[in-house]
């Protein structure tokens, strides 16, 4: 595990410095893909921050080389900060000559959570550009989004407090240990598409062991295992249908006559109807072809029979004339009979070839008959419907409620999924401890008042019931979509906003769907599901289409005696007693494993996230009312009376491409931190246009050297103000006309100091003084 000082990583860091990443096209392409960026072109977001790329193609090529090299450098050793000098050392001349551009790229990627995030050792200094009162941030929620936002904001020089209403870190990522010491994950337990997820970097930083899931899965239909050939057959059918839907979803919006979005269930039914219709047409054409070939075969056979009889009759008559000695008496008849025999035999050969062709065709048609139905309505249809049930498990709702245009499933299905031996909650807990975040548990936010000037006021209920008011310059809300839905209907169990949320945001919250995935977690005295070549993940197909997404997927971590299954959508909201749910689960297991399955588990736990007052559901999805702008409207920050954006929103429900995923939650927190920094301390790029901004006074005092695992040292408010050149309240603020001269002197001194140093050190930027 990681230490507070990061000394454990020294050997690996030295090796990374000596060897460096393998910078070739394949490595650069892999690095860009792992960061979810295109390898061969800049994104629109990058073009907005680097407008000089519009000028000529060469600038784009250089930018892509440096950007991808930066990503590769960070991914090679994410235990240590990736600096501009590290990147320059890994790029060949002359592309490493523009250190300012490299610095800007490193700054951009760091700011937006693509490099230098999580738990790593810093080698540069952190700059604080705001006075203490103006750099305070309160993050509501200590889930993946909250931890991500807090760690990023602290790296950017903000003072962060995280408020968590629960008694532990993780939010909807929750786990506990049973009496026998087994980890039971009651919340999010799977990391999806991990190969291009920031979670892979976090796993590497804390040295956690992960296990792939759903790579090869056993399938049981009515208690009998399905052979792998049939499994792949159904998978191919599903992938074809899924691919067709995804293709159509990206062509245009799909709405019905009333203007409502078409559901994925309706789209699948339409597709299956088309397949059934196509199958019937093929069956009709097959029958028609079979009948035509059979008639042709019969016709050729009759022709052969007739020609044979003709030749036989002529031959018999010719023999008779020969026996009677009349061959010379009637030469015309003799020649006529011989001609009939020759003609019949010649024609017979032609007809025989045609008959053989028709007969072979007829046999092939009978050997490979055309199916009358695309899918058997019994077990085959139920098995295929399990694939749709797997989609419901990923979304958390029945496909009847999910928009056809929803394309977030591809970011959950494709790629490698993994579970952790220690549990995902432990990953976030260790990361928070190593970063020494100020997380205050059992602090429930009751009201978010953004009506003030230059601050946001929170009303917080502490563990003992006392109400406390907390003030911050900025707030990052990671309240789940289920809680926000309760807020807009004035449910007393949900926090309130003062003033009320804007109508556009309220409508967006109302339109985004909130799924529900509950778990039935069973602990046994032994692992029976891996016996006889079994696997840690398996499927039991339900014959009932209504329950196709519930209690069908079973998952466990290798070596663990805990087995869990999932209950999805409306089935998850049924208020069945725990013992009934456990009994239903055991019935499914006993059908699949027979006598190998124990009669009952030694312990069990049922989750009910839809009733959890701090969640009210499992995650967001695109409902039939969700518009393309809904997610942007939800994450639109709220402005205080001074016109400044101060309340920002994060959470998986603000990440449209990765809803209902831990990865989406983490990415949304990094995005919110970047938005706050960009809005209030500026982009912070080096001016490479030729007219550089002047650097401020007392630059060295502004730079604070810290380890990322350590707490940023506190500074006196007056001292912090004095550190900022020409600040309004600074005691020795310089006049504007004196600034260029002072800046010039500082630059000369800085250049002299650099010349004396054996190793070049990059200086973090100070905002330009206007």
From Swiss-Prot:
EC numbers on record: 1.14.99.66
GO biological process: epigenetic regulation of gene expression; regulation of DNA-templated transcription
One GO MF term attached to the UniProt entry: FAD-dependent H3K4me/H3K4me3 demethylase activity
Region (Disordered): 1-21, 718-739
Keywords in alphabetical order: Chromatin regulator, FAD, Flavoprotein, Nucleus, Oxidoreductase, Repressor, Transcription, Transcription regulation
GO cellular component: chromatin; cytoplasm; nucleus
EC main group: oxidoreductase
Presence of the UniProt keyword Zinc-finger in the record: no
Gene3D superfamilies assigned: 3.90.660.10, FAD/NAD(P)-binding domain, Winged helix-like DNA-binding domain superfamily/Winged helix DNA-binding domain
Free-text disruption phenotype from the record: Progressive loss of fertility and accumulation of histone H3 'Lys-4' dimethylation (H3K4me2) over generations. Suppression of sel-12 mutant phenotypes, possibly by up-regulating hop-1 expression.
InterPro entries membership: Amino_oxidase, FAD/NAD-bd_sf, Flavin_monoamine_oxidase, Hist_Lys-spec_deMease, Homeodomain-like_sf, SWIRM, WH-like_DNA-bd_sf
Cofactor(s) the protein needs: FAD
Chain sites annotated for binding FAD: 137-165
Subcellular location: Nucleus
Signal sequence, start to end: none
Catalytic activity: N(6),N(6)-dimethyl-L-lysyl(4)-[histone H3] + 2 A + 2 H2O = L-lysyl(4)-[histone H3] + 2 formaldehyde + 2 AH2
Family: Belongs to the flavin monoamine oxidase family.
Stated role: Histone demethylase that specifically demethylates 'Lys-4' of histone H3, a specific tag for epigenetic transcriptional activation, thereby acting as a corepressor. Acts by oxidizing the substrate by FAD to generate the corresponding imine that is subsequently hydrolyzed. Demethylates both mono- and di-methylated 'Lys-4' of histone H3. May be involved in H3 demethylation in mitotic cells including gut and embryonic cells. Participates in the transcriptional repression of the presenilin protein hop-1. May act via the formation of a multiprotein complex that remodel or modify the chromatin.
Description of how the protein assembles with itself and partners: Probably part of a large repressor complex. Interacts with CoREST protein spr-1. Interacts with chromobox protein homolog hpl-1.
Name this protein carries in UniProt: Lysine-specific histone demethylase 1
Organism: Caenorhabditis elegans
Taxonomic lineage: Eukaryota, Metazoa, Ecdysozoa, Nematoda, Chromadorea
Gene that produces this protein: spr-5
């Amino acid at each position: 595990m990681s230490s507070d000082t990061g000394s454990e990583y020294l050997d690996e860091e030295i090796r990374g410095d000596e060897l460096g990443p393998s910078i070739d096209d394949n490595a650069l392409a892999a690095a860009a893909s792992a960061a979810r960026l295109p390898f061969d072109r800049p994104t629109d977001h990058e073009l907005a921050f680097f407008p000089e790329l519009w000028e000529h193609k060469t600038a784009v090529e250089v930018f892509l080389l440096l950007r991808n090299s930066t990503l590769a450098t960070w991914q090679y050793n994410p235990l240590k900060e990736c600096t501009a000098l590290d990147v320059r050392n890994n790029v060949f001349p002359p592309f490493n000559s523009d250190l300012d551009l490299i610095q800007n790229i490193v700054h951009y990627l760091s700011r937006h959570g693509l490099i230098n995030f999580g738990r790593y050792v810093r080698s540069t200094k952190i700059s604080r550009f705001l006075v203490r009162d103006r750099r305070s941030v309160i993050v509501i929620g200590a889930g993946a989004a909250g931890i991500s936002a807090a760690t990023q904001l602290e790296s950017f020089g903000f003072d962060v407090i995280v408020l968590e209403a629960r008694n532990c870190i993780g939010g909807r990522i929750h786990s506990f240990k049973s009496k026998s010491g087994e980890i039971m994950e009651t919340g999010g337990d799977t990391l999806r598409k991990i190969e291009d997820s920031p979670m892979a970097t976090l796993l590497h930083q804390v040295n956690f062991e992960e296990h792939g899931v759903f790579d090869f899965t056993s399938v049981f239909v009515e208690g009998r295992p399905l052979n792998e050939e049939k499994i792949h057959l159904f998978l191919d059918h599903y992938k074809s249908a899924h691919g067709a839907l995804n293709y159509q979803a990206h062509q245009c919006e799909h709405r019905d006559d009333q203007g409502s979005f078409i559901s994925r269930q309706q789209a699948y039914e339409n597709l299956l109807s088309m397949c059934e219709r196509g199958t019937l047409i093929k069956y009709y054409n097959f029958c028609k072809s079979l009948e035509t070939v059979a008639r042709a075969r019969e016709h050729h056979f009759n022709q052969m029979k007739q020609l044979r009889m003709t030749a036989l009759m002529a031959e018999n008559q010719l023999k008779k004339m020969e026996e009677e000695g009349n061959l010379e008496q009637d030469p015309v008849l003799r020649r006529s009979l011989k001609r009939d025999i020759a003609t019949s035999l010649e024609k017979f050969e032609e007809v025989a070839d045609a008959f053989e062709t028709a007969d072979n065709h007829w046999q092939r048609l009978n050997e490979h008959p055309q199916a009358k139905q695309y899918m058997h309505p019994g077990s085959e249809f139920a098995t295929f419907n399990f694939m749709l049930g797997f989609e419901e498990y990923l979304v958390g709702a029945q496909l009847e409620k999910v928009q056809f245009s929803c394309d977030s499933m591809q970011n959950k299905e494709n790629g490698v999924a993994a579970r952790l031996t220690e549990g995902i909650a432990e990953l976030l807990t260790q990361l928070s401890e190593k970063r020494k975040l100020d997380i205050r548990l059992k602090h429930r936010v009751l009201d978010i008042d953004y009506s003030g000037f230059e601050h946001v006021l929170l009303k917080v209920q502490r563990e003992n019931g006392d109400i406390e008011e907390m003030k911050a310059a900025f707030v990052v809300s990671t309240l789940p979509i289920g809680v926000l839905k309760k807020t807009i209907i004035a449910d007393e169990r949900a926090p309130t906003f003062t003033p009320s949320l804007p109508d556009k945001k309220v409508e967006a919250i109302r339109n985004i769907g909130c799924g529900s995935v509950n778990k039935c977690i069973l602990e046994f005295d032994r692992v029976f599901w891996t016996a006889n070549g079994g696997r840690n993940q398996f499927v039991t197909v339900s014959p009932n289409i209504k329950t196709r997404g519930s209690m069908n997927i079973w998952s466990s971590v290798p070596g663990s005696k805990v087995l869990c299954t999932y209950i999805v959508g409306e089935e998850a909201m049924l208020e069945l007693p725990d013992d009934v749910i456990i009994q239903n689960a055991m019935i499914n297991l006993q059908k699949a494993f027979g006598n190998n399955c124990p009669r009952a588990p030694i312990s069990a736990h049922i989750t009910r996230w839809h009733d959890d007052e701090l969640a009210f559901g499992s995650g967001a999805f695109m409902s039939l009312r969700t518009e393309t702008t809904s997610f942007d409207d939800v994450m639109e920050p709220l402005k205080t009376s001074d016109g400044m954006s101060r309340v920002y929103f994060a959470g998986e429900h603000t990440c449209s491409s990765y809803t209902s995923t831990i990865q989406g939650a983490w990415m949304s927190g990094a995005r919110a931190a970047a938005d706050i920094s960009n809005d209030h301390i500026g982009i912070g790029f080096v001016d490479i246009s030729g007219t550089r901004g002047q650097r401020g006074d007392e630059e060295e005092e502004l730079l604070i050297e810290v380890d990322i695992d350590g707490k940023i040292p506190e500074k006196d408010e007056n001292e912090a103000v004095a550190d900022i050149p020409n600040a309004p309240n600074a005691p020795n603020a310089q006049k504007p006309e004196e600034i260029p001269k002072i800046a010039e002197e500082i630059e000369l001194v800085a250049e002299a100091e650099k010349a004396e140093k054996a190793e070049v050190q990059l200086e973090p930027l100070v905002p330009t003084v206007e």
